[in-house]
Amino acid sequence: AERREARYQRRKAARMAKKAAALREYGDFETVFSFERLYESYRASVRGVGWKASTQRYKAASLANVTKTHEELIAGKYRSKGFYEFDIVERGKPRHIRSVHISERVVQRCLCDYCLVPMLSRSFIYDNGASLRGKGYDFAVSRVTRFLAEHYRKHGREGYVLVFVFSKYFDTAQHE
């Protein structure tokens, strides 16, 4: 019993040390929002949307914009600019779009890439491929295919698939 308790305490201490190290790395505001990381987030945020006029304006003074954002964040004076809201009709279906400004996308990307994803992804199941690097559409399709084949081997054609559609989920989330 003493050996088990000692082993439990050692493992508990190791888990706590690992958690403390992660908190030091991902929980420090100045580290997460360092100029270098904000600039990397800016580069990632403009990838694929360089044709937009707002992105081109931001890119024209990118160093000044990233520096200003960094200074506001460190000083505690950064404020969200809110959303651009507009309506479109896509494949005959009207949609209400809420889009954030490129400068806000940079901050969100920095927070996600250097804090939230590293901290939270350790608790995700392997099969979660939602917006994780290296786990895109092909990963999700291969996992579903594998699970369906496994189910078919065990149970034949008996069974069912549940499909959930979250309608207006973004509208119900608190944005303040």
Question: Residues of each region from the PLM?
Answer:
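Active-site-proximal segment of RNA-dependent polymerases
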Residues: 25-28, 112-174
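Non-catalytic, well-ordered alpha-helical scaffold segments
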Residues: 36-39, 63, 67, 104-109, ...
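Intrinsically disordered or highly flexible coil/loop and linker segments, enriched in small
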Residues: 38, 51, 75-79, 153-154
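Short, solvent-exposed loop/edge-beta patches enriched in aromatic
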Residues: 77, 103-105, 115-119
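Short, conserved non-catalytic motifs in the polymerase core
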Residues: 48-56, 81-106, 123-136
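Non-catalytic, polymerase-adjacent accessory regions of viral genome-replication enzymes
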Residues: 1-67
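An acidic intrinsically disordered interaction segment
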Residues: 67-84
